[in-house]
Design a protein with these regions (language model features):
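N-terminal binding-site loop/beta-alpha segment at the start of enzyme catalytic domains
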Residues: 1-76
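Conserved, mostly hydrophobic/aromatic
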Residues: 6, 18, 35, 50, ...
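Structural preference for beta-strand elements that scaffold enzyme active sites
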Residues: 13-17, 48-49, 75-81, 109-114, ...
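Acidic-and-aromatic substrate-binding clefts and catalytic sites of carbohydrate-active enzymes
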Residues: 28-29, 53-62, 85-90, 121-124, ...
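Structural motif
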Residues: 41, 45, 104-105, 141, ...
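Structural motif corresponding to the early beta-alpha repeats
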Residues: 56, 71, 75-92, 117
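Distinct, well-ordered alpha-helical segments
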Residues: 61-70, 90-102, 106, 123-131, ...
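Beta/alpha (TIM)-barrel catalytic core signal, keyed to glycine-rich beta->alpha loops juxtaposed to Asp/Glu
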Residues: 118-301
Length: 301
């Protein structure tokens, strides 16, 4: 396993992190015992960055991490997010959300608490509500670091500029066919010593043969995906998962990304991605070619 430093927190974290959406039944039913096996397999392989959220399975993902981490809590860097979708981003709701997460996770502290889905609130509401609550929770020792999560980079930038945020998690913005984090956004995260977490380097499944169910009828999106894939066909390897390895290696070896998240519902899927975490990735010239090919071209809105 390869490790990196999570920005200004100074913590050493695995370059490959385990995302908790799949084991929270977000993409289909995963038996509880199977979820435990996935979590234990991750820890046994040296993965110490575990990512979940109150929203995933309406708390089920957190509950499963809580069960699986009995006796192993000190081995991992445990992260979650607040608040649940559809609830306000105010101070009281945030406090209640984090307290509920602590109970489900069966722990008395969270290593990293993150504002979830920043696009669904406003900067002022979040700063006076969620972020204010996070800062008080940090003073109380219930959280150790504070982050923000979202897909719209322009929404995330003002939070980074406050100086009160330690990490930023975004998704589908640093992948083979959408490189929009490259350039100004990475310059901003470097300037503020952000720990950058990259979610969904496979684009919610569009870099595989099985896009996420909620994308399978978006014909315009899938047509654009096919067009972009054709432009990088030389990277595709034989077999049904031809873009998976180059996509994972592209993210795992980016100097500006501390952690790349993988969602796994079965241990075998996790092991496949662990095999790519050996420090081998595209050359500087190959990376530059990708950045030039899709510069400024967002795939997802």
């Amino acid at each position: 396993m390869q490790y990196s430093t999570l920005g200004r927190t100074g913590w050493r974290v695995s370059r490959l992190g385990l995302g908790g959406a799949a084991i929270g039944n977000e993409f289909g039913d995963v038996p509880a015992a199977q979820a435990t096996r996935v979590i234990h397999a991750a820890i046994d392989a040296g993965i110490n960055y575990l990512d979940t959220a109150a929203q995933y399975g309406l708390g089920e993902s957190e509950r499963r991490f809580g069960v699986a981490l009995k006796g192993k809590r000190q081995q991992v860097f445990l992260t979650t997010k607040a608040v649940m979708r559809g609830t306000p981003y105010d101070y009281a709701t945030t406090m209640a959300s984090v307290e509920a997460s602590l109970q489900r996770l069966q722990t008395d502290y969270i290593d990293l608490i993150q504002l979830h889905e920043a696009e669904t609130t406003t900067f002022d509401v979040a700063m006076n509500g969620c972020i204010a609550a996070f800062l008080d929770l940090k003073k109380a020792g219930k959280v150790r670091a504070i982050g923000v999560n979202g897909r719209n980079l322009s929404v995330l930038a003002p939070y980074i500029q406050t100086g009160q945020i330690d990490t930023v998690l975004t998704f589908c913005r640093y992948m083979l066919i959408d490189t929009t984090m490259q350039g100004d956004f990475f310059a901003l995260t470097r300037a503020h010593q952000m720990g950058v977490i990259n979610g969904s380097p496979l684009g919610m499944g569009v870099m595989t043969d099985t896009p996420a169910p909620f994308l399978q009828h978006d014909h315009d999106l899938l047509a654009e995906v096919a067009r972009r894939k054709a432009q990088i066909a030389h990277l595709c390897q034989p077999g049904p998962h031809g873009f998976v390895e180059p996509a994972m290696r592209y993210s795992l070896t980016c100097d500006d990304i501390a952690v790349t998240l993988t969602g796994a519902a079965v241990p075998e899927q996790l092991q496949r991605n662990i095999a790519f975490c050996d420090g081998q990735g595209p050359s500087d010239s190959e990376r530059a070619s990708l950045h030039a090919l899709f510069a400024g071209q967002r795939l997802f809105a």
